[in-house]
Amino acid sequence: MSISKESSKTMIDIEKKGGEGKDGKGGSKMTKNEQFLLPFTFILIGLSSLNVWNTALGLNINFKYNTFQITGLVCSSIIALFVKVPKMLLPFALGGLAMLCAGFQIAHQCFTFEQFDTYCLIAFIVIGIMAGLAQTIAFSVGTTMEENMGGYMSAGIGISGVFIFIINLLLDQIVPDQKKFNVNEAKLLYLFLICELCLVLAIIFSVCNLELSSSKTSKEEEYSDKEQGLSYLELLKDSYKAILAMFLVNWLSLQLFPGVGHKKWQESHNISDYNVTLIVGMFQVFDFVSRYPPNLSHMKIFKWFTFSLNKLLLLNFLRLLFIPWFVINAACDLPIFTNIVQQCVCMAMLAFTNGWFNTVPFLVFVQELKKAKKKKDIETISTFLVVAMFVGLFMGIWTTYIYDFFPIVIKRYVVP
């Protein structure tokens, strides 16, 4: 998959230098405009494709809708794994998301509760599919460019959280607290309007700055497509560390957030809506902040933010210690565990490691490949990583229901 007009030499650089561009030794062949516009385009795609998810979190909308969205993401990843998704679908997927956002505004104003609930269930599945296809295409395109843009895509996903969080805080000060179907009417209207504007901008920038037309495929890419690549089994053996790391980080994050923290914390300790906004905001802000240092690892101060996949796997297993911490925050009534500052620190640490460990695999996997050197094979592995991310999210959000079988929520009895 080609990206820009000058990206036809991508795999020569990848094969021969294995990431020299990142250190600046190989020299960039992109123009000054491309050096700004391409990263911005991928950031915008990541931002807009995840805004709907973060809007649902910000509105504290029914948790089951989130599970249906993740199910849609997995469906899209399965499609991408067995079917070569045309690059031209990227702007159409983003356009579909924009239309679904408009549908939320109409449904909330005009439908009955049962109709709105049905629309949400269907729409969130389709949103998951559309967002998944957009992210799969963008990651596949970005990771095979002359300069790896996968990290910028990941950064855009992180920006979405803090972007929606800030808008949420501003709207809390401006709009009335009038609710319909237990959702703030004005906030839903404005948040989805902002989602639509971001998606329109993403469509414009992707069409103008990315080479999405298959008719303009370079000779080198045509030759690469005809050339026999490695089998799926060989590619899995070559990239299993990156795939496993991607699965683990997303599985744990979605198992604990938002199902245990903040949902079960709120049930146990009657946390106010404002404090819930702060806790959710901690995840969004620190997930955003942590996605940038790995992209700046060419600077000495940020050098330790990227490391080998072996170290990343070890850190992912250590990250399992968040499970008892989150459970205790729900199950224990001691002042330290009901303290909002401690809860925010807990959520911030989960979020920081989530964004950080999600970004590293896309930046380092190419250098650690032993057999896969062709562009076609690297595109396939990039798709594997996106599939691992979505399957991890899917397994995480559905296994969060396991905690319903344990008495971790403190029962509050009302005295008559």
From Swiss-Prot:
Report if keyword Transport is assigned. Answer: yes
The residue spans the entry assigns to the Extracellular side of the membrane are as follows 59-64, 108-119, 172-187, 262-273, 332-343, 404-416
Instruction: From the record, give the transmembrane residue ranges.
Output: 36-58, 65-83, 88-107, 120-139, 149-171, 188-210, 242-261, 274-292, 312-331, 344-366, 381-403
Question: Which coarse location class describes where this protein primarily resides?
Answer: membrane
Q: Which GO molecular function annotations are given, in alphabetical order? A: nucleoside transmembrane transporter activity
The domain of life is Eukaryota
Write down what this protein is called.
Nucleoside transporter 1
